[in-house]
Amino acid sequence: MKSEELFSQAKELMPGGVSSPVRAIKPYPFYTAHAQGAHITTVDGEDLIDCCMAYGPLLLGHAHPEIKKAIAAQLEKGWLYGTPTPYEPEFARLITGDHPGMEMARFVSSGSEATMAAIRLARGFTGKSDIIKIEGGFHGAHDAVLVKAGSGATTMGVPDSAGVLPALVAHTRQLPYNDAEALEAMLASHHDIAALIIEPVLGNIGPVLPEDHYLREIREITSAYGVLLIFDEVITGYRLGIGGAQRMFGVKPDLTTLGKIIGGGLPIGAFCGRKEIMSLVAPQGPVYQAGTFSGNPLSLAAGIATIRWLHDHPGIYPDLAEKARAIGDSIGGGAGGSFVRIGSMFKYFFRDSAPKNYTEVKECDTAAFGRFWEKMRARGIFLPPSQFETNFLSAAHTSDDLATLAGGYTACL
């Protein structure tokens, strides 16, 4: 069946015809038959260079042989037990060892579940009710973080989705990114804040990068007011390097959430932090968290294989950063927009300068992006279909792929 036919069927059986809204490409999404390396093959027989990489998890590319080997070996032994497995302490030791100050980890099944549990834990540890999130920061699809607030520093949250109770998100406040002074002002006047949760690099509207000293400043401010700092590194964890953004920028959060890359392409999440805080998680403490699929052996086997491969190939990170730089260099300064990159994350913003926060991101010309995306798609290049999603490179992108990407940007901008 062709993609259009499949989508016609799906619309009758599934809301919007998709399992996640971002996949609802107009007029209909392509359906993938298989993928290998940096390429997707659609059911219509098209070959596409993939710069979406499943929205971040596939740092090593599609169907990496080491990951396949680890999954296949575990499949022979079974794929779900409902009991602890030897993978759990092994993987927890790997992850905590890669992040300074991180002492304990709890595995869950998604990044959303990880941030939900981390927020609950922060409230349980501090005894305080409210959280702060950054405008434009994405932390999953649970109620506490589905908030769209005004630009005022003290504006209370209002729901960003039908079905979310205003009384619940009244405990979620928003602040602009790259504004440490706004954080200081809020904490000076509000004493009910349990935690600030933040993507150290805004990935779901970007990448939008932290200005000099911003992350260190918010670390100092939260510490001074007894507020926990939660780094949501579901995207940046192992994407920017071993140790993620916190190692890159030299900032130690109290709690960290991980996902995407640590599962090697299988569903996973983790929340991690200091033993003093993590010890409150059940069954050791009173903060409840549980899940049938938490720590499932397939995901952990794939995750361990991924992280061990990264340890064995440290050159991947400078190599990926160079690949992203080369794409930016191919564009030059004459296209009228702004190319932003960090590590293997990159984006061309249809705005004359790199955005510093959510307000500036919203100034981008989304119609121009739509036309650009269609042109790139016609050239066999698959970018995330939104001005507000990050592009990702992988270890599998070859020099030929990069040349095609550079040529596409040059021709389509």
UniProtKB/Swiss-Prot annotation:
Coiled coil: none annotated. GO terms for molecular function: glutamate-1-semialdehyde 2,1-aminomutase activity; pyridoxal phosphate binding; transaminase activity. It is found in: Cytoplasm. Belongs to the class-III pyridoxal-phosphate-dependent aminotransferase family. HemL subfamily. This is Glutamate-1-semialdehyde 2,1-aminomutase. Its main location: cytoplasm. InterPro entries: 4pyrrol_synth_GluAld_NH2Trfase, Aminotrans_3, Aminotrans_3_PPA_site, PyrdxlP-dep_Trfase, PyrdxlP-dep_Trfase_major, PyrdxlP-dep_Trfase_small. It catalyses: (S)-4-amino-5-oxopentanoate = 5-aminolevulinate. GO terms for biological process: protoporphyrinogen IX biosynthetic process. Pfam families: Aminotran_3 (PF00202). The modification N6-(pyridoxal phosphate)lysine is found at K260. NCBIfam families: PRK00062.1. Gene3D superfamilies: Aspartate Aminotransferase, domain 1, Type I PLP-dependent aspartate aminotransferase-like (Major domain). Keywords: Cytoplasm, Isomerase, Porphyrin biosynthesis, Pyridoxal phosphate. Its EC number is 5.4.3.8. Transmembrane segments: none annotated. Pathway: Porphyrin-containing compound metabolism; protoporphyrin-IX biosynthesis; 5-aminolevulinate from L-glutamyl-tRNA(Glu): step 2/2. Its cofactor is pyridoxal 5'-phosphate. It comes from the Archaea.
